[in-house]
Amino acid sequence: MNIQALLSEKVSQAMIAAGAPADCEPQVRQSAKVQFGDYQANGMMAVAKKLGMAPRQLAEQVLTHLDLSGIASKVEIAGPGFINIFLEPAFLAEQVQQALASDRLGVSQPTRQTIVVDYSAPNVAKEMHVGHLRSTIIGDAAVRTLEFLGHHVIRANHVGDWGTQFGMLIAWLEKQQQENAGDMALADLEGFYRDAKKHYDEDEAFAERARNYVVKLQSGDTYFREMWRKLVDITMTQNQITYDRLNVTLTRDDVMGESLYNPMLPGIVADLKAKGLAVESEGATVVFLDEFKNKEGDPMGVIIQKKDGGYLYTTTDIACAKYRYETLHADRVLYYIDSRQHQHLMQAWTIVRKAGYVPDSVPLEHHMFGMMLGKDGKPFKTRAGGTVKLADLLDEALERARRLVAEKNPDMSADELEKLANAVGIGAVKYADLSKNRTTDYIFDWDNMLAFEGNTAPYMQYAYTRVLSVFRKADIDEQALASAPVIISEDREAQLAARLLQFEETLTVVAREGTPHVMCAYLYDVAGLFSGFYEHCPILSAENDAVRNSRLKLAQLTAKTLKLGLDTLGIETVERM
């Protein structure tokens, strides 16, 4: 149940009845403070201005038409014309019952869409590094949320599997007589890449051979395609280990690398020329865009084919968007790519729209993100100043979590300890990232992310086990509990219930904006409200069975909400800490 949507509909109807236009926005929001009720309708200001009347006067007229019987216990006008809505305890109790009766906690499913989500995108012949973390885990949280809401999600791992470097790599592979690249560890392959590059820079004959190999690879020569495939396979096999460690849902089947779009590129260049969008300029094929200006204030030229006939990333991105609409039948396409690529994407998509490859009705959304920084505020590096490998980061997370967990659980079996350390360590790295607004840079800090206080994975995982501990202590008759009514009589019960019932609203925001930090903030809030409820509203020592069972049901919905919410983030819960 989406209470915000229900109230929006009711307030909108009342506004129209009071003389507002049919497209009026009620602007129903969750209230920031308890004294303002559970929800506020803030839309009177804008509409009253259009109608030439005072907002408070409009609010008074709206109230005469607003029927919230059975939903709100009190509705009042505040300030210049805000409408504060206080939910009826009986309504909250009924909604809690309905949520508990559903595996989905009463979350409805919107109209099903086909949504393509582009995320992770590592490069072939290179090991994943910390720069891939944000795209991979933020994108995966979006995918999990969209799938939970019932959408058909197509994961698109836009792997860097094409380019001139492959001639160099194949030539070096051949020179070293290492055609069995599929048996090499990726760490070796990365060293192999460095050696190949060094040789390419220093040996002109080798470089010439590498350039010839690129031509042969691009012309589809069987031998060179086979060598290229080996390099791709070993890379993706190793990357899959990282995805599995991160509890990310990407698989080999989701790879849609740059090479996929190669056959489309000549046709796209020819079509853009035929449509008068692309022209020859200094030997290259260029699209001049009025929407983007160069330093002189003239339309910016975007090259789609170099004078030597080679294509650019922009050409591939145009083909990519076209493919996702025409072949994958996307209703919406989300790109989890860092903010530095924004202008590049906007230029490609402007060309896509002008060419008519993707209609305006299909959103192409750049869900950009900032950088991961060290404590010094600079890009996160090793002590030696090198790039941090993602596998090394996860190893350290596991080691730190192992020490932390062993300290708190000296009697835990080695097997159990390892499972718990994995959930806490990997969860801590992911949650530290997901809990920050993706558009900003954030400081990577081991001490903060592994703390048991504050908005961290260990705190959230502990909060979940704390709720479960109530049920371990209680001698519960499952059947009696299922049929027991929910009674909301205390303020803290009402506050917890109202927040729990905002789960669907939170999911809706995350799905619309691609902002998992909103889910993190919501779950942290729920954990805090449960803590206050637990301290002030005795559960197991309640005054009678009816109150005890009702409070157990609130605890039950809290546990289910925390577990399901953390699952949409890809954070593992544990039964004991």
Swiss-Prot record:
Keywords: Aminoacyl-tRNA synthetase, ATP-binding, Cytoplasm, Ligase, Nucleotide-binding, Protein biosynthesis. The keyword Magnesium does not apply. One of its GO terms (cellular component) is cytoplasm. It catalyses: tRNA(Arg) + L-arginine + ATP = L-arginyl-tRNA(Arg) + AMP + diphosphate. It holds the Pfam family DALR_1. GO terms for molecular function: arginine-tRNA ligase activity; ATP binding. A motif ('HIGH' region) lies at residues 122-132. Its EC number is 6.1.1.19. Disulfide bonds: none annotated. SMART domains: Arg_tRNA_synt_N, DALR_1. InterPro entries: aa-tRNA-synth_I_CS, Arg-tRNA-ligase, Arg-tRNA-synth_N, Arg-tRNA-synth_N_sf, ArgRS_core, DALR_anticod-bd, Rossmann-like_a/b/a_fold, tRNAsynth_Ia_anticodon-bd. GO terms for biological process: arginyl-tRNA aminoacylation. CDD domains: Anticodon_Ia_Arg (cd07956), ArgRS_core (cd00671). It is found in: Cytoplasm. It is an enzyme of class 6 (ligase). It comes from the Bacteria. Its main location: cytoplasm. HAMAP family: Arg_tRNA_synth. NCBIfam families: argS (TIGR00456). Belongs to the class-I aminoacyl-tRNA synthetase family. Monomer. This is Arginine--tRNA ligase. It comes from Salmonella paratyphi B (strain ATCC BAA-1250 / SPB7).
